[in-house]
């Protein structure tokens, strides 16, 4: 009963805050799975649940990029992602998903903070600070970084790492054999859970945990037995990593991704002290202030509070907290040094690990130490004289000045974080009254409880009880205040769904049903209004489609591209994601874009309408603002924005004779480099149903495939066809050496037309094709893809 009484204030605080968070989520629906990355993350999970196989690290579908590998953020061990598969309406699923993510984060932060040595009160305050400042819906109040609105799966990774760090720190601390075995097993299970939920992002999330955990362990000077148990836990993870083939999985993905930087590491500069000094002196680090110590950015003040708290912990504490505080200060400092090299472009392929990931990795520790200076008595900051000697006046003055400076800095931090909520809102008398009434209610409740407990003799000091109550009430009260001024958000509604409905009926894919062709969205932008945005953007020409989303959403209530189509299972040629392939970019930029077009590696897009090329890659429908298409395209409908007379109508055209796996070339032209292949495709583009360009010599044939059916299946496709002899089918899917015929059918897969798949067979075939790349697989296939790219000159 006494334990429940002690826990009750904490439970009430969390219950009230959780209820207000859910209310906020209902009023701020666009804070959950925010466009564009958040929408994409949600679609990615839902598509994997529908088209993927459990625990497949290379989930494959024809929904985007002509059979591209999904970004491997997998739902199978991620409860927040699995919630998106619940039979609820769309908004309810999002709320449940985020509620699960928030619960994971809160529990794991408390667990890690307690394992380091923080009190229950400070651990709870740290968890509530994290959830309130950085997690939807109240993250919109502060706009520090919309990370969890865009990439909510990171919450699961953070929770797994928090719990894993706590298990690792506890492992071997006692001689209890069952306990140590259980902790080693928990550490391995959490490692596997994080790794299999998001293989790449998980690795990016680990640096702070590695550095700070190592500092804590070294600071303890543990006995050999503890070292042995910790080494065993780490060894188990290494055995799983290397034994499951994950090393070649990472190397293969890096070798084929368009996102991998191609510039070499600038070792001459990295190893030069003079180059570093010049960089520190002349490079404006705060040109990208996000998450760095740049005071014009609101998030910098959270970092400042954490650094002050870490310094306070070093002076006033001993043990793990002191070691963790020192490690956090060193880590943030080194992260800023890394930021200089990252922004200067010195890191080459290692630049895929951006500075933002390094800071995001230590957010849990930042929030733990950010609460320290607010709850640590300032008197403990005063310097202690040795022995019983009295402190000199200088030391007294130094302690007083230090206390005042810390207090002023904390006030500035609070003001800077709380001012201008939601960017353009203001606090008024109503918010002041809400805060005062809520605080008064807390004080009244405390006095009432103390009076009741006083009768039974079980009562804490008034100061302790009131302090605990105020700390636990801070964030629920702030939530009440911020909800009172939160702007209401309305989700855009589609004004005329005729085009998307037509595509859903005639082009959507389902497991076990035939493939019916891709859709491509191509903006001509006749008046130069669709892609209006900053000129010096890394998006380059892809800004036409990036800014086009908002342009069409404001006028039509839909974007006519990407997740708006993928959510309806409408497959597209274009792709948005981190791992769009080098070969697909090479094809699109050389054959479906004007000369000199430059785009961002995350965007696979079409910039020119070439019906012959588009047919060959399987495009059947084109959404465009162009008025007409040549070569007999049939108009299937159009929509207009009545309230925007200058906005172009969006039209839907259907191309005749698209390649639905129905192109059966009989003649083959050999070409060895990408430029040569592109030239041969251009020369023969009017007969790509008869001619294919290959790198390996293939003899001509007279037999053509007939009765071809290409069926969508989980993690792959099935092709059935017949012929009168040796024949070939040009499949509208990206080629990879990882495509495997898994049912023993006599079919051979090779590369054609730079990045398409050519299937060769004799007389009859029923081939089940899967993309095999992941756990316990021969992942060297992806490395061979990378070697192909080099041989092609990509």
Where on the chain are the PLM-derived regions?
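Membrane-embedded helix bundles of polyisoprenyl
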Residues: 14-20, 98-116, 120-175, 179-218, ...
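Aromatic-rich transmembrane-lumenal/periplasmic boundary elements in polytopic membrane proteins
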Residues: 18-61, 240-279, 529
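Active-site lumenal/periplasmic loops and adjacent helix-entry segments of GT-C-fold
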Residues: 19-162, 290-294, 564, 568-569
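Contiguous transmembrane helix-bundle modules in multi-pass membrane proteins
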Residues: 128, 152-155, 159, 171-175, ...
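Periplasmic/ER-lumenal interhelical loops and adjacent helix-loop junctions
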Residues: 230-315, 338-347, 351-356, 360, ...
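Extracytoplasmic/lumenal acceptor-recognition loop(s) of multi-pass membrane glycoenzymes
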Residues: 51-53, 58, 70-73, 475-496, ...
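Active-site-proximal, structured, solvent-exposed surfaces of multi-pass membrane proteins
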Residues: 185, 688-794
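Aromatic/acidic, Gly/Pro-rich catalytic loop(s) in extracytoplasmic/lumenal soluble domains
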Residues: 617-679
